[in-house]
């Protein structure tokens, strides 16, 4: 489902021409625990932050992207890596390495997605599930530059059938598509259009808790935002 979201965003950039200059993404960790951000760039876009790095509590890291950059960011949790960068994460793992290169995060994972251009399109997506509170805030810019994200900790309200647990604790919340693999939850087959794929009771749990985040594949109207000539702050645990 994440690939569907990136493809949609990539098409959106055709509505605007490329702006000059660069965009700065500042990743901020307000969690009480270390987060290992992963980055995945779209076709033709440069890799940011070597694909992944460590972000300690209270730390921030700026990453500079070209004006046509597209891709996504996510947070990995409970990771352990050796000196060569090999290891694993309990949530959001990207192939047992610190630097994700061209591997996306293993669901369930909260995603911050971007396609930059004359108009930047951005969203926070829970289509692939949830693992870390996450927000995107535009810095400067003009347009519909509202903050997108999921501030709530969905692990505390995740339905039991979607819960991912470790040592008796809920550590992530799966999407209904991942949990049940049916067309009505995955928006595939006979349910593969906005007209035939409606919000489910599970996506409504996500939407109620996080009204500016994507809760299912066709949740565009209240979940995609546009801004021009802005930089962006991506915050893990924004309410902390």
From Swiss-Prot:
Q: What induces it?
A: Weakly induced by abscisic acid (ABA).
Q: List the disulfide bonds.
A: 31-237, 79-89, 94-100, 145-227, 150-210, 158-173, 177-186, 187-197
Give a short account of what the protein does: May be involved in disease resistance.
Example of a GO biological process term? defense response
Which SMART domains does its entry note? THN
Q: Which Pfam families does this chain map to?
A: Thaumatin
Keywords associated with the record: Allergen, Disulfide bond, Pathogenesis-related protein, Plant defense, Signal, Stress response
Cleaved signal peptide residues: 1-20
Q: Looking at the keywords, is NADP present?
A: no
The protein's name in its UniProt record = Pathogenesis-related thaumatin-like protein 3.5
Q: Which PANTHER family match?
A: OS03G0233200 PROTEIN (PTHR31048)
Q: Which organism is it from?
A: Cryptomeria japonica
| Nucleus as UniProt keyword | no
Entry comment describing in which tissues the protein is expressed? Strongly expressed in pollen grains. Also present at weak levels in seedling roots, in sapling stems and in developing male strobili.
Regarding protein family, the annotation reads:
Belongs to the thaumatin family.
């Amino acid at each position: 489902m994440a690939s569907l979201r990136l493809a949609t965003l990539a098409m959106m950039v055709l509505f605007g021409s490329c702006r000059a200059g660069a965009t700065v993404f500042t990743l901020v960790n307000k969690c009480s625990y270390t987060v290992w951000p992963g980055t995945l760039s779209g076709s033709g876009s440069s890799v940011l932050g070597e694909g992944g790095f460590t972000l300690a509590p209270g730390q921030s890291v700026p990453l500079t992207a070209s004006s046509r950059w597209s891709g996504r960011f996510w947070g990995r949790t409970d990771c352990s890596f050796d000196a060569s960068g090999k290891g694993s994460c309990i949530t959001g793992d990207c192939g047992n390495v610190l630097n994700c290169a061209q591997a996306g995060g293993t669901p369930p994972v909260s995603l911050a997605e971007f396609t930059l251009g004359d108009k930047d399109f951005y969203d926070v997506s829970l289509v692939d599930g949830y693992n870390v509170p996450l927000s995107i805030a535009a810095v400067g810019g003009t347009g519909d530059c509202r903050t997108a994200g999921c501030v709530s900790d969905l692990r505390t309200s995740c339905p039991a059938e979607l819960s991912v647990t470790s040592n008796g604790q809920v550590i992530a919340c799966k999407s209904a598509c991942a949990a049940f693999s049916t067309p009505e939850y995955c928006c595939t087959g006979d349910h593969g259009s906005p007209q035939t794929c409606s919000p489910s009771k599970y996506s409504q749990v996500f939407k109620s808790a996080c009204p500016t985040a994507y809760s299912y594949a066709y949740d565009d109207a209240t979940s995609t935002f546009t801004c021009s000539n802005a930089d962006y702050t991506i915050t893990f645990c924004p309410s902390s």
